[in-house]
């Protein structure tokens, strides 16, 4: 009897050796220098009387922007590097800065036995649909068709951005069908403080050009710890995440109506379930999360059906209660935050010809609680139609029509 048996080959990961890393790794150094061709008001020295009344009218540093980045990469298994940056107007080597204003270091190791990922220094996280933790990039309304695998991810952070990352250690392990991730972060951050020393809001622009902006630099520390466990099969995955944050100062929500359900403590706890099922042309994924403050919750679910390689359809539902608080949440939304929003999105994509692609979507959104400038519930709708035509190998034409209507104070949309 003669028979043939075929199976996927077992890939053996090579051992990482110092000699190999030094010889075959890729080193890269890049730098950027921006020289403005005009003089902004912040660099003009005002009269002494004006300067005494408002010292924040003058930038403390020169008008040059500069950064330098070093990165090392060995295949897709080992990465490390650092970044140093000075924004235009920030002091260099003075006012407490050790040369540059901001520094960042990252180290990432992948695929060493059961250890899938190890990150040290600065890193990014993504779990589920981002309702609990997501410091990675979120999809826009026109890119939902391109969404890939939503498995938990730990990635290196090598950007010049001074927000949307964690600093510490993170690790992911795989035991058969179970993925386990754990992380800890200690991160100094910027904040605007009230007179009593509580946090009014977190400052995210990373600019420290004036005395006022410097006074907000790293005046708060954020400690974060969390874990995620995900069970995977060929067609289905189910995961649970728990995330805890502690700030060195308490938040203060203020007295404004729209801020009534804003953060008002220094400790925050979030937990969520994320799930995904895919089979042939259909895929469904989502997440449901809860927060300890105000008892809020949030859920987001989306489905994609591909009729064939030319036609596909997507639908997305979201419901974020106004009591939900997720300071590290980042997901699909109209209002830019995972709170006080519900809505339904549907879109289609068609390629009747190889050179032609048509896409359209409609998104309806509703805000059940007051927003800044709108002291009542509000709603809106957005629709887009786009045509992409590949004329030749060198030319591509695109056209887009977009309609968006949002309710304003005292005016229906």
Q: What residue ranges belong to the model's regions?
A:
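Alpha-helical interaction/regulatory segments in DNA maintenance proteins
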Residues: 2-26, 127, 312-315
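Transmembrane beta-strand segments of Gram-negative outer membrane beta-barrel proteins
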Residues: 18-54, 72, 76-82, 118, ...
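Short loop/turn motifs that connect adjacent beta-strands in outer-membrane beta-barrel proteins
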Residues: 20-26, 76-77, 109-118, 127, ...
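Outer-membrane beta-barrel translocator/receptor signature
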Residues: 39, 46-52, 56-68, 72-80, ...
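Outer-membrane beta-barrel and related beta-rich outer-membrane complex signature
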Residues: 43, 130-134, 187-200, 250-254, ...
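Exposed, low-structure sequence patches enriched in small/polar residues
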Residues: 59, 63, 164, 220-255, ...
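Surface-exposed extracellular loop regions of Gram-negative outer-membrane beta-barrel proteins
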Residues: 66-100, 106, 136-146, 243-292
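Outer membrane beta-barrel
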Residues: 96-190, 312-325
């Amino acid at each position: 009897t003669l028979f043939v048996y075929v199976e996927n080959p077992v890939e053996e990961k090579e051992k990482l050796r110092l000699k190999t890393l030094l010889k075959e790794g890729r080193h890269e150094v890049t730098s950027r220098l921006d020289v403005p061709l005009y003089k902004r008001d912040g660099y003009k020295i005002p009269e002494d009387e004006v300067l005494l009344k408002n010292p924040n009218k003058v930038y403390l540093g020169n008008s040059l922007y500069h950064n330098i980045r070093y990165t090392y990469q060995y295949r897709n298994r080992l990465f490390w590097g650092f970044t140093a940056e000075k924004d235009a107007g920030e002091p260099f080597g003075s006012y407490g800065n050790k040369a540059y204003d901001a520094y960042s270091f990252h180290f990432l190791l992948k695929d060493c036995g059961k250890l899938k990922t190890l990150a040290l220094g600065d890193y990014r996280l993504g779990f589920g649909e981002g309702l609990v933790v997501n410091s990675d990039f979120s999809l826009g309304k026109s890119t939902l068709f391109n969404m890939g695998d939503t498995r938990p991810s730990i990635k290196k952070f090598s950007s010049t951005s001074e927000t949307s990352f964690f600093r510490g250690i993170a690790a992911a392990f795989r035991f058969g069908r179970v993925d386990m991730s754990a992380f800890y972060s200690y991160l100094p951050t910027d904040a605007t403080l009230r007179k009593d020393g509580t946090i009014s809001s977190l400052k995210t622009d990373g600019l420290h050009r004036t005395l006022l902006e410097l006074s907000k630099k790293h005046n708060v520390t954020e400690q974060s710890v969390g874990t995620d466990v995900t069970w995977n099969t060929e067609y289905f995955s189910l995961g649970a995440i728990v995330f805890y944050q502690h700030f060195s100062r308490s938040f203060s929500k203020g007295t404004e109506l729209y801020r009534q359900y804003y953060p008002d403590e220094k400790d925050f706890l979030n937990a969520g379930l994320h799930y995904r099922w895919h089979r042939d042309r259909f895929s469904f994924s989502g997440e449901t999360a809860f927060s300890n403050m105000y008892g809020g919750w949030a859920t987001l679910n989306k489905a994609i059906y591909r009729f064939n390689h030319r036609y596909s359809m997507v639908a997305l539902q979201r419901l974020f209660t106004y009591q939900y608080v997720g300071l590290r949440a980042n997901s699909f939304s109209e209002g830019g935050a995972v709170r006080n929003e519900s809505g339904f999105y549907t879109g289609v994509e068609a390629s009747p010809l190889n050179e032609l692609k048509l896409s359209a979507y409609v998104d309806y959104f509703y805000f059940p609680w007051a927003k800044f400038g709108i002291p009542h519930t509000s709603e809106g709708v957005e629709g887009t139609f786009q045509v992409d035509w590949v004329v030749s190998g060198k030319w591509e034409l695109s056209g887009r029509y977009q309609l968006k209507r949002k309710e304003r104070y005292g005016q229906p949309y």
